[in-house]
């Protein structure tokens, strides 16, 4: 079975790296669009309705849809693989993982995501695309649907495009685990995890994840990401209280919420990776 991984950990993980643009000449360029959404009542049923009083409001529980496009030619005509992502969140953003069922990384490494508790889903459920595109289209709005990504993989000595599903799960210890699945033209089953950490200054928390370099063929170029769309956000009811993974701050600084994202690209040792960094202002919700 051939295995590949589209370098798209930025999912959601870029789940809050708002408005990234490359500042390094040798690194890829990353364009990000973000939309705050209400939270699905049931992540396993994307058309099952949303929790009331969630979405883009001050102090409200919310989900975050992130769409991004990566461009570059430094890796044989394509962007280099993503190796690490760090996302800083503004002060006042509440992140809560306690109380949610979890799915262990070992379960995903065993390629048994069906054994994960349904309430451990941190993103809408879906199925891997059953057809491969000739080229990656612009990332489309999900409207509460499952995360998808498109990129380039090596197959039979050539570079071809492939689309995959992205699924996020609550992880033991308070982080998030991700599972990327594709069926054509290569079989893709790639798990990885990330953790929330403390931050200082303008930021309250940060999320950090590392992505393994995956080669489809020995000695062939690794898989890379070109576009992705993913929604991260979940909530459960405990008695009369709604517990949400993410909650918007009750106040917004003049000019918007500060945000920061760093992404490392490369196929060699860590010392050769190129880092893309940007600090941005996220518009305040309308009152």
What are these regions (language model features)?
Residues 1-10:
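Bacterial N-terminal signal peptides that target proteins for export
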Residues 16-25:
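C-terminal segment of classical bacterial N-terminal signal peptides
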Residues 10-13, 36:
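N-terminal regions of proteins, emphasizing targeting and processing segments when present
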Residues 25-287:
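Ser/Thr/Pro/Gly-rich, low-complexity intrinsically disordered stalk/linker tracts of secreted
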């Amino acid at each position: 079975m051939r295995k590949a991984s589209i370098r798209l950990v930025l999912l959601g993980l870029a789940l809050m790296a708002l408005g990234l643009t490359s500042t390094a000449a040798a690194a890829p360029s990353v364009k990000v669009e973000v939309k705050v959404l209400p939270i699905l009542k049931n992540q396993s049923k994307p058309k099952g309705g949303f929790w009331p009083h969630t979405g883009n409001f001050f102090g409200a529980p919310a989900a975050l849809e992130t769409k991004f496009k990566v461009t570059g030619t430094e890796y044989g005509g394509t962007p280099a693989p993503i190796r690490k992502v760090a996302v800083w969140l503004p002060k006042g953003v509440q992140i809560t993982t306690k109380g949610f069922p979890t799915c262990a990384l070992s379960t995903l490494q065993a390629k048994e995501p069906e054994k994960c508790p349904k309430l451990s889903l941190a993103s809408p459920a879906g199925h891997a695309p059953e057809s491969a595109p000739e080229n990656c289209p612009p990332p489309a709005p999900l409207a509460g649907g499952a995360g998808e990504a498109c990129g380039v993989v090596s197959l039979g000595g050539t570079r071809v495009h492939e689309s995959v599903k992205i699924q996020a799960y609550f992880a033991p210890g308070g982080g998030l685990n991700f599972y990327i699945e594709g069926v054509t033209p290569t079989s893709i089953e790639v798990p990885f995890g990330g953790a929330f950490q403390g931050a200082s200054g303008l930021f309250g928390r940060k999320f950090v994840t590392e992505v393994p370099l995956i080669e489809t063929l020995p000695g062939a170029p690794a898989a890379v990401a070109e576009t992705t769309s993913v929604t991260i956000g979940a909530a459960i009811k405990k008695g009369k209280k709604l517990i949400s993974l993410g909650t918007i701050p009750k106040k917004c600084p003049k000019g918007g919420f500060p945000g920061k994202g760093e992404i490392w690209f490369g196929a060699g040792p860590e010392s050769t990776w190129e880092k893309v960094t940007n600090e941005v202002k996220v518009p305040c919700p309308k009152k």
